Design a protein with these regions (language model features):
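Multi-pass membrane proteins that catalyze or facilitate reactions on polyprenyl-/lipid-phosphate substrates
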Residues: 1-151
Length: 151
């Protein structure tokens, strides 16, 4: 099961990166490492790969401190989400006509609030050196999905 394997991969990367607590600043990160991080972000196209999980982990391995890694990870997501939005504009206009503006607005508001709270929670975990707490979740759900796929 691809999703299960990808969750386990994400868990391994998060666990492996937990002991990296370097002090490198974003401006000191070599350009090549920024490019690698952007490429690794592309792994999130695979189901079960956490985009923020893999990018934060790889940035920590590259030497960024945990909070800077998280902030950089969220910044490099902006071009990806803007690109996806541009690709979907035509479809979005049809959906807006079908669903109605108030429903879209409520969905946008709920999504914005939950995203803000999720990011705040994640930053708090990272600040407390507890990002690796996601590892058991990744392993357990990954193993469960693989097991279910074998039955």
């Amino acid at each position: 099961n691809l999703v299960g394997l990808c969750l386990i991969f994400t868990g391994v990367l998060i666990w492996y990166s937990k002991d990296y607590n370097n002090k490198l600043e974003i401006q000191d990160l070599p350009s090549s490492r920024s490019i690698y991080t952007g490429i690794i972000q592309g792994l999130a196209i695979l189901p079960g790969v956490s985009r923020s999980g893999v990018t934060i982990s790889i940035l920590r391995i590259f030497g960024l401190n945990p909070l800077k890694a998280a902030k950089f990870s969220f910044l490099i997501f902006i071009p990806a989400i803007l690109g996806a939005t541009l690709l979907q504009l035509n479809e979005a206009s049809r959906t807006l006509e079908e669903v109605g503006g108030s429903s879209i607005l409520l969905g946008f508001l709920a999504s914005s609030i939950s995203s803000f709270l999720s990011i705040k929670f994640l930053i708090r975990l990272i600040d407390k050196q507890q990002f690796h707490y996601f590892t058991p979740y990744c392993f357990l759900v990954g193993i469960f999905l693989i097991y279910e796929g074998l039955i």
